[in-house]
Amino acid sequence: MWINFVKLRLFCCLLAVLMVVVLVVNVTQVEYLDRETASATFIDSGGQFVSSQVIRISRNPYCGYERQILSSRERLEEDSLLAALQWQEPDVGPVPFLKSTDPSSSYFVILNSAAFFRVGSQLEVLVHVQDFQRKPKKYGGDYLQARIHSPKLQAGAVGRVVDYQNGFYKVFFTLLWPGQVKVSISLVHPSEGIRVLQYLQEKKPDRVYFKSLFRSGRISETTECNVCLPGSLPLCNFTDLYTGEPWFCFKPKKLPCSSRINHFKGGYLKGLLTATENAFFQSGVNIKMPINSSGPDWVTVIPRNIKETNSLELSQGLGTFPSGYYYKDQWRPRRFKMRQFNDPDNITECLQRKVVYLFGDSTIRQWFEYLTTFVPDLVEFNLGSPKNVGPFLAVDQKHNILLKYRCHGPPIRFTTVFSSDLRYVANELNGIVGGKNTVVAIAVWSHFSTFPLEVYIRRLRNIRRAVVQLLDRSPKTVVVIRTANVQELGPEISLFNSDWYNFQLDTILRKMFSGVGVYLVDAWEMTLAHYLPHKLHPDEVIVKNQVDMFLSFVCPLET
């Protein structure tokens, strides 16, 4: 009996050991799978749900970002975002300038040419790129922008570009108005330049540097600051306690970290490129240069049947592309009827008894400036804030309107921001009660263009969490997101704020806020589709259309 008991005990021990071994093997396999692949369902650029295997992208960790504590859902989302933004880099070695993309020898042709098209028809354009020796290129990776327009009608819309990775591109347009419609295709950057921009994004995120002034009594010191600082010198850790957003400054030699009084842009690093790389960034040669047509560059569009009018005028669903178009200089969204606020009284009536918060960079500060200029009853209060920095406040006491603007937290390239005014949007949102008379608009993008994408994803994750909480406690709060926009580019600005960088940020923004319950002002299409030159701060006619769209969300047309 004793022997049987010993055997039974031994058997149980062996069984326990076997179970532990199996458990360890399974855990190891799960961790391995988690590192390599993850199954995901996400929304593609067309707004359609796509089930896919998301491959974990191998990226160099940036500072402390590899030590982020992410939930499995957050990790999956980040991996899918990075995978979706993987630019199709050609598998070629170093390319000499003469073999890079030459917009002047490249051309496009209208494929489905016909005597005329009807409004609502699809127009397809084939682009073939060649090098400076007029030889066809065998790989893709160029960044193109495309639009259709009718100058006499002040009409315009953007097109969707598909890269076939063999030197050919196809552009798809939806013809949205009658008349003579012209096609315009531009090379923003050749694929050889994109490779340089990718390198800078991952290896040189400190190419814009920041500084802070520390002062105590008569002693003052200025040190460099950033999301991440190199070396082993002592640091002041200004990481936000609530959001976990990292920010550091080199510690002053004689002063405590608590003596910091401001933040400002230090400057831009010079000498980032070699002579060979510089050749890929030349104004008038290969930056935002037109690609000419081989044959007609226009088509004739006739009105559609009367029965089809309503179905095209308001196309429903997230997948609507383009999201809108210009006609007679007025933006016409395709998903809803936008109001025209041409009289200041219309805006006053809309915003009566409301508190409006504008958070973000200088592109949404333009909304504050437009509203306070256009609406005479909105009187700006002098808060003693630095010019172009804020915070700013405007009040209409008669109609009980309060309008506020505050810039987002670092990184921000403004001239001088007091330390007390360095506020993160997520924290500000957490302090808002919300309700039917509360309006929030957010624009956060331009100051993140020099950083790895994980930095921007983290910022939007924090903002989104705060937005969801705000809408949860006050569902009638109106929250509007302003997207990125295109801008003028030269050899230097391309290295810091290229449209290619901002296109990535814009894609992330749209995906992360899809399905959250916010409204979107599509500043990207509204600047790209317009006939005016691209600017970081668009001209007033474009800003007016943006504000009209914003106000249309706040005060929609009665149906």
UniProtKB/Swiss-Prot annotation:
It comes from the Eukaryota. It is found in: Secreted. InterPro entries: Ig_E-set, NXPE4_C, NXPH/NXPE. One of its GO terms (cellular component) is extracellular region. Keywords: Glycoprotein, Secreted, Signal. Glycans are attached at residues 26, 237, 346. Belongs to the NXPE family. This is NXPE family member 3. It comes from Bos taurus (Bovine).
